[in-house]
């Protein structure tokens, strides 16, 4: 069996469907499969009738899954998007860090790491983690002669009309326009559509059905132009994309390379243009600053995690909301504690099941003996009734009826397999085992704080690398290849090679001055004492328009009716988004301390 680790369910599905169509016995194991489908898949694995199994990296954190794999001969571990393992990579994913440990535990004899965007530093990191010798590291060239790279320095207020003019030259050719923000994709698509262009927006904020419909329309040629965030493109295999426009600066040269790489896969010439404006740097830097957790929040989480009994479970979602830290940061912290030998992940489980009977309960019970009927009656009596669904908590039910939680979960799965009930599991929790306590908790805390500070600095350096590239006076392709450890004299067909020299600096707009009204607004927000805005960083994020777990909190409208709305509906949300995050953070610190 070859085990393939891939980061996206959509990508796995496309690849497995393609392999099966070619007669190759491949399968995927992911959260979209039903209990019955999962059971059938395991049966096929046990019979060795599957050659390739695709899983997400998180799947290997499941102790039960690893126990099943240990019984199956594994020939190869293939890791797609392997740059995700590197702290220095542009798309670090903490679960990738544990893959080396799992490869050793499962005694997999060979590992294949694949990536299209590894810098020399990231490649060294991958080789170090998987003990890959230098002679086994193979790198193909990043140069593609059919991609014409263009950088156009342009002011924010000129960008939209310039893009319209460019698109009108060939309005029917397949084109992707990348924007940073979801509302940017929406507003730009709306503008271009009003000018008669066949365009649709695409971003993660759309419903999955809408995203699928838009993607299908683009693939078929019905809609040739897509305005999208980076949510669009992974797994898109359309060979005739003729143009890629970066309406905003990309967040790294790795992202830029990945995105322009979607053009011209048929070998024909394609146009890749970056509309470079310094103003974008402020927005991207704000996101980076906003992602960095508060030291006090990290101290609190470490204290909670390392003061647990031997076996415990947590909800990443609950920890995230309680400490106003993004779930990815929580996952990174948990992974770090695992790699340091403090914790060991066991198995995830759902703490709540919504249950709907597909037939009358009495009719269902008639199919069982009296002992099981009694057990099922008691079990369903513990559930909280709703309009269409019962809500059952296995842990609470176990305590009430004196049965094990494992038996209750197994029973729910069994009834679902029989199609006696429909089930919606929710509130995922991850089990952990505490292996040891730190000898010096303050020192460990400081190491964790430093870890996230390094991450912030690394992300900011990548942003600056994009600006440096945009201002290069020499060949753009040579500049890009140098970033990935390749050498090239000049390509002869980029905008620099065609004689278009860059300005000394990218066009930029000055941040507006803060007014007395702005300072008064900040103080009023402090005086509200909202739970989601109690720290300077949370308040600064809110004012700069960044979403975080805290912005999902509710606040009471000041009308005396005790009506609640989410914080992001507040008039002050994103009011200071044109200001640098660091400046707003300093003001918030001064106001809260005062």
Language-model-detected regions and their locations in the chain:
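Helicase motor core with emphasis on the C-terminal RecA-like subdomain
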Residues: 1-3, 10-364, 370-371
